[in-house]
Swiss-Prot record:
This is Small ribosomal subunit protein uS3. Signal peptide: none annotated. One of its GO terms (cellular component) is cytosolic small ribosomal subunit. Keywords: Ribonucleoprotein, Ribosomal protein, RNA-binding, rRNA-binding. Part of the 30S ribosomal subunit. Forms a tight complex with proteins S10 and S14. GO terms for molecular function: mRNA binding; rRNA binding; structural constituent of ribosome. HAMAP family: Ribosomal_uS3_B (MF_01309_B).
Length: 236
């Protein structure tokens, strides 16, 4: 089962928590969920060059707090905060709540599965040899402290007539072990030969305590992300 299921979904409530953190009754649930989807679509579209790994949405009383986890916070903020103010206004057009945007810096993007997958996909689009891109990502992750990493690339690799799947693994990636801290990311490369899919699993160690927030705490303590987020509040 652990080989097939999304490893993040399998560990929700054990050592990882949801990226949408709010509660609503039946009357508002659908509306708020649709807002979350639109907010994420807009932010990913506007911040293509900002290396965004996660977007966490929280809804305290009459507010919408959006936390953007990015490896390039300067690109998100812009000159004198101009870009983040534009983003806040775009998000405010979707939701009726007061909007607060926080930026959390990812200090080691080589250990974030989503950013690794997107990096490989971008290299495939630039016609970099897929084996070289995969090996480089594996070496970088292991050098920075990952206990294991696996990368799958599938599609018409290298322009081959027949699509196939190639994979590399170094270290161990225990997908069945629920206490394992495994990050998972996917990306799609749009090449002239068609689309190529990239999947990345990164094993960062074990989390022994039963705490849904354990992974976030561990990243802040271990230097994976800065513990002091930068914020821009709604002027209203």
């Amino acid at each position: 089962m652990g080989q097939k299921i999304n490893p993040i979904g399998l560990r929700l409530g054990i050592n990882r928590t949801w990226d949408s953190r709010w509660f609503a009754g039946k009357a508002e649930y659908g509306k708020l969920l649709h807002e979350d989807v639109k907010i994420r679509e807009i932010l990913h579209k506007e911040l293509k060059q900002a290396a965004v790994a996660r977007i966490v949405i929280e809804r305290p009383h009459k507010k919408c707090r959006v936390t953007i986890h990015s490896a390039r916070p300067g690109v998100v903020i812009g000159k004198k905060g101009a870009d983040i103010d534009k983003l806040r206004k775009r998000v405010a057009d979707i939701t009726s709540s007061d909007v607060v945007i926080n930026i959390v810096e990812i200090r080691k993007p080589e250990l974030d599965a989503t950013l690794v997958a997107e990096s490989i996909a971008q290299q495939l689009e630039r016609r970099v040899a897929f084996r070289r891109a995969m090996k480089r990502a594996v070496q970088s992750a292991m050098r920075l402290g990952a206990e294991g990493i696996r990368i799958n690339c599938s599609g018409r690799l290298g322009g081959a007539e027949i699509a196939r799947m190639e994979w590399y693994r170094e270290g161990r990636v225990p997908l069945h072990t629920l206490r394992a801290d495994i990050d998972y990311g996917v990306a799609t490369a749009f090449t002239t030969f068609g689309t190529c899919g990239v999947k990345v699993w990164i094993f960062k160690g074990e989390i022994l305590e039963h705490d849904p927030m354990a992974q976030d705490k561990r990243m802040n303590e271990g230097g994976g992300e800065s513990s002091q987020p930068r914020s821009r509040r709604d002027a209203a």
